[in-house]
Amino acid sequence: MKSLWRSLPLVAVLAAGVGDATAAGRRTELVQYADVQVEVVAEGDGPAVVLLPSLARDSDDYDQVAEGLAAAGFHVLRPKPRGIGRSTGPMTNITLHDLARDIAEVVEKMGNGRAVIVGHAYGNWVARMTAADHPKLVRGVVIAAAAAKQYAPELTTAVTAAGNLALSNEERLAALRFAFFAPGNDPTVWLTGWHPEIRNSQRAAVAAVRQDEWWSGGTAPLLDLQAAQDPFKPESKRTEMKDEFGERVTIMVIPNASHALIPEQPKAVVEALTAWIKKLP
């Protein structure tokens, strides 16, 4: 590709205030276990759906999607990654298994012990690891704008540049257009919302495990929710997951979207998630 430029028990859940109001009420709670605390934004009532954000970004990215899912009859849970907001815990010498444990604790305490896990970009790795490690808690897995098994290294460079606050806006916008936003979609919405201080920790957690430990996403039904113009999963890799895992995989492709997907086409994401989840047993 051409480069653009050179185990301990769950201890408690604590009410922690009220966030922006929605029809079903948006609220914040804290899930605590061992030396970890996870801040969770919750809204809606119904079957639980957990939304996990992209690398070095917050679950706030899902605001519109969460509101849409809540209106569609779901209990939407958005755990903030360690190091963001009031989510705390070890940031070094951790693996993807530890981050998956955070999500499992949220599902057990706030999701009635069973949930659909949606992971966007980096979050899809956490979602798959959660499903592999804690299959009884996972009703289904959605990998949204998930990268192919192998992708061009300059895309990783672009992701780093997009969230590098020391670079000029022009440099960051170039990276956002290259790796994240389809032509005609506004990349400026992602000039903010980055937490570069957690990026290395998150990447190290993935690097500490073998890809085959999480790649399958367990055995639950899996939705491969793709963006039509995502360079991390070009059209030639469209059926990669289904070819490997067969009928448990459903492929849906959202047009006019790239790797960012969530801010690009929130309504289409809500519609796709709702349609697929409502067909689950």
Which residues make up each language-model segment?
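A short loop-to-beta-strand scaffold at the N-terminal edge of the catalytic core in hydrolase folds
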Residues: Y33-A42
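Conserved HGGG/HGGXW glycine-rich cap/lid loop of the alpha/beta-hydrolase fold
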Residues: V41-R86
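Active-site loop/oxyanion-hole signature of alpha/beta-hydrolase fold enzymes
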Residues: A71, R78-V118
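Catalytic nucleophile serine of serine hydrolases
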Residues: A121
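Flexible "cap/lid" loop of the alpha/beta hydrolase fold
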Residues: W125-A132, G140-L167
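Conserved alpha/beta-hydrolase catalytic His-Asp/Glu region
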Residues: A152-P153, T157, N164-G218
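Conserved serine/cysteine hydrolase catalytic core
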Residues: A204-E244, V253
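Catalytic active-site module of serine/aspartate enzymes centered on a nucleophile-bearing elbow/loop
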Residues: R248-P281
